[in-house]
Design a protein with these regions (language model features):
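A short, Lys/Arg-rich alpha-helix, primarily the initiator
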Residues: 1-17
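Residue-level signal for the short linker/turn that defines the boundary of a DNA-recognition helix
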Residues: 8, 18-19, 45-48
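Short, charged recognition helix plus adjacent turn
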Residues: 13, 55, 63-77
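Residue-level detection of the helix-turn-helix DNA-binding "recognition helix"
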Residues: 15, 29, 40-42, 69
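Short alpha-helical DNA-recognition segment
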Residues: 18-37
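DNA major-groove recognition helix of helix-turn-helix/homeodomain DNA-binding modules
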Residues: 29, 48-63
Length: 77
């Protein structure tokens, strides 16, 4: 691991389940490069992709990710 890389909770959960990054990439339908960048803290995801990873790992999304993208509340909400 390079000094600029950090280990994330996503990677911890993946490794604790004995899964390869390729298996999670395929199962969550997320490109392997994207998943790698997420795991080292280089990239954020929109909520739908984060949810795919959380669902595949069977972990609540809030245990893996901080909300970083927000949508304006519509008047009908």
């Amino acid at each position: 691991m390079l000094a600029s890389e950090q280990k994330t909770i996503v990677r911890e959960y993946r490794e604790s389940k004995g899964l390869s990054i390729k298996e999670v990439s395929k199962g969550a339908k997320i490109p392997i490069g994207t998943l790698y960048d997420v795991e080292i803290g280089r990239r954020s995801l929109k909520d739908n992709k984060a949810k795919k990873i959380a669902d595949f790992l069977e972990v609540p999304i809030e245990k893996l990710f901080r909300p970083t993208y927000y949508r304006a509340i519509s008047i009908t909400d």
